[in-house]
Amino acid sequence: MLKRIFIYTLISFTSSISFAQNIDSITVVKTKWERTRIAKQVKLYRHHFNQKNLFAANENISFLEIKNTGRRAIFALGAEEKELITTSNFGIRDTAIAALNGNFFDVKNGGSVDFVRVNGKVINTNRLDKNGERARHQQAAVVIDNGKIMVKKWDGSTDWETKLSEQNIMLNGPLLTYNTNDELLDTTSFTRLRHPRTCLGIKPNGKILLLTVDGRNENSAGMSLHELTKLMKWLGCRTSINFDGGGSTTLWVNGMPNGGVVNYPTDNKKWDHEGQRKVSNVILVKKK
């Protein structure tokens, strides 16, 4: 009898999870996003799920969709070896259409803790974990060649990133999905708990999504990496990679209100557009 009750409970629990996921996926797919044309081949999408109707929470999501042709809109990296700069100031300095915060960095001393190469020059190298192993955010790379952006997966070798042919490289992660296959995520609080998130996704048609999910506020809970993985798949991405998030999460678009800051950065602990954290590097979208 107890065995039957256990099996019934397990089936019911599994069914409820599947039902919730199905509801969430339908919610995302059927959402009427606020859409703004930013430039040729660049569109901005925004929506505030404010009825606790995505993952049973409020979620504020913003993303750019960019044609990855290397023609009218091109990708580039902005980076500093030591100095920390806000995402918006990186964008303004480099006369960009848009900017998205990049990889993980030393908040106290400045400089990325992950390998970065810009126009052939190495800006920062990897700081390995205490056990000498690569961090999860050093096991994939965003690379740019002739203005086109791609994601590459670490091959397991020690100096993998130094042998990549692209002149512009930013290690980042963890990788969430690669060519439609979900990557195995760890069980740390960074993965399991909800935080503001920054993410890059690639759709089957080659279009790129640069996405932010706001968090640490009653207006937007943030997401776990498992939730972020699902969101990117529901938005049609076959590959997606997590960037530095938390207080760093910022999407800036030239010409938009609030100084171009589209999302709600959290470093000031207020629900406004003023809470940018200074960062080490960014992904840039520029006119060719």
Predicted ranges, named:
Residues 21-134, 140-141:
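Zymogen propeptides
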Residues 83-88, 160-166, 219-225:
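A short, polar/proline- and glycine-enriched secondary-structure boundary/capping micro-motif
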Residues 105-190:
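Active-site-adjacent helix-turn-beta-strand microarchitecture at beta-sheet edges
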